[in-house]
């Protein structure tokens, strides 16, 4: 299982742990990933995704999974999230 957020694309970063004596040792900064189930209002389905805590707050702020995916850039989304986005767009196009 990769350590990349499916909605925001956040991935591990590298850097230094710096001690009080200014000694530096390499470390990894891992994203805070959580397994969550999000519900699409348009599709009436639930989807299990592995997303970061920051992405979960953004989904809530934008008003749900459908609104988040409508604004999200395709480059940041995983293949699974991109498929959900295309399916939502298709249903909205037929409904309009």
From Swiss-Prot:
Species in which this protein is naturally found: Cereibacter sphaeroides (strain ATCC 17025 / ATH 2.4.3)
NCBIfam families linked to this entry: L28
GO molecular function, one term: structural constituent of ribosome
Pfam families named among the record's database cross-references: Ribosomal_L28
Keyword Nucleotide-binding: no
Disulphide bridges, residue numbers: none
Matching InterPro entries: Ribosomal_bL28, Ribosomal_bL28/bL31-like_sf, Ribosomal_bL28_bact-type, Ribosomal_bL28_sf
Protein name in UniProt: Large ribosomal subunit protein bL28
Keywords assigned: Ribonucleoprotein, Ribosomal protein
GO cellular component term of the entry, any: cytosolic large ribosomal subunit
HAMAP family: Ribosomal_bL28 (MF_00373)
Family affiliation: Belongs to the bacterial ribosomal protein bL28 family.
Residue span of region Disordered: 1-23
GO BP: translation
PANTHER family: 39S RIBOSOMAL PROTEIN L28, MITOCHONDRIAL (PTHR13528), LARGE RIBOSOMAL SUBUNIT PROTEIN BL28M (PTHR13528:SF2)
């Amino acid at each position: 299982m990769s350590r990349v957020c499916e909605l925001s694309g956040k991935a591990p970063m590298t850097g230094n742990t710096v001690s009080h004596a200014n000694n530096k040792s390499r470390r990894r900064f891992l994203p805070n990933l959580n397994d969550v189930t999000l519900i699409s209002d348009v599709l009436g389905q639930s989807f299990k995704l592995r997303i970061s805590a920051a992405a979960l707050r953004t989904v809530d702020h934008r008003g749900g999974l459908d609104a988040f995916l409508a604004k999200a850039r395709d480059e940041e989304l995983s293949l699974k999230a991109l498929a959900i986005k295309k399916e939502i767009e298709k249903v909205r196009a037929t409904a309009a």
